[in-house]
């Protein structure tokens, strides 16, 4: 039993380690760097584009704010304002490790609070986009939020599954 526990701990720490890019991918369009808190950690985010709709992109495990640069660029060119961010323990954010799926949900909720506190940077509508771990975070963030639409790609049907 102890062996299984230790093996589980080892696998967990390997999967949910700190993720860094070398070098960080380029976005290809102007982006404003923003920081906000999620618990004790300072997270780094980027806001680009203009428009009445704000799309918040929650990346998958091991990815950062610019890992979806082609999609961000396409959304911005289509007239959306896009906010993407690095999770705890990933890329430009602080933290020793990404800490797993529950932390991603906490980080997305912190990002949404930050955006609401800043008037969504002038946007009236809010759309959440999540892939993999980010899709899970989107499902977790929906209850009680003021989201107009959500796209969850490979993230689970609910936070309980």
Describe each model-derived feature in a short phrase:
Residues 98-119:
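Alpha/beta-hydrolase active-site loop
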Residues 86-101:
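Glycine-rich "HGGG/HGxG" loop immediately N-terminal to the catalytic nucleophile
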Residues 139-161:
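Hydrolase active-site cap/lid region
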Residues 130-140:
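Glycine-rich nucleophile elbow surrounding the catalytic serine of serine-hydrolase chemistry
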Residues 61-74, 87:
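The serine-hydrolase catalytic nucleophile loop
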Residues 52-60:
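Short beta-strand element of the alpha/beta-hydrolase
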Residues 1-37, 43-46:
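An N-terminal hydrophobic leader/cap segment in hydrolases
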Residues 120-132:
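Alpha/beta-hydrolase fold nucleophile elbow
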């Amino acid at each position: 039993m102890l062996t299984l526990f230790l093996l589980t701990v080892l696998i967990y720490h390997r999967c949910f380690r700190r993720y860094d890019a070398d070098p960080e991918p380029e976005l290809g369009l102007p982006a404003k760097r923003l920081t906000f808190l999620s618990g004790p950690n300072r997270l780094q985010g980027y806001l680009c584009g203009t428009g009445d709709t704000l799309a918040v992109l929650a990346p998958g495990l091991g990815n950062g704010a610019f890992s979806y640069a082609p999609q961000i660029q396409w959304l911005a060119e289509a007239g959306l304002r896009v906010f993407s961010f690095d999770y705890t323990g990933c890329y430009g954010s602080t933290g020793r490790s990404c800490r797993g799926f529950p932390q991603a949900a906490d980080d997305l909720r912190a990002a949404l609070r930050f955006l609401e506190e800043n008037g969504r940077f002038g946007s009236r509508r809010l759309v959440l986009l999540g892939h993999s771990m980010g899709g899970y975070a989107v499902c977790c963030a929906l209850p009680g939020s003021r989201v107009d639409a959500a796209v969850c790609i490979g993230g689970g049907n609910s936070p309980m599954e």
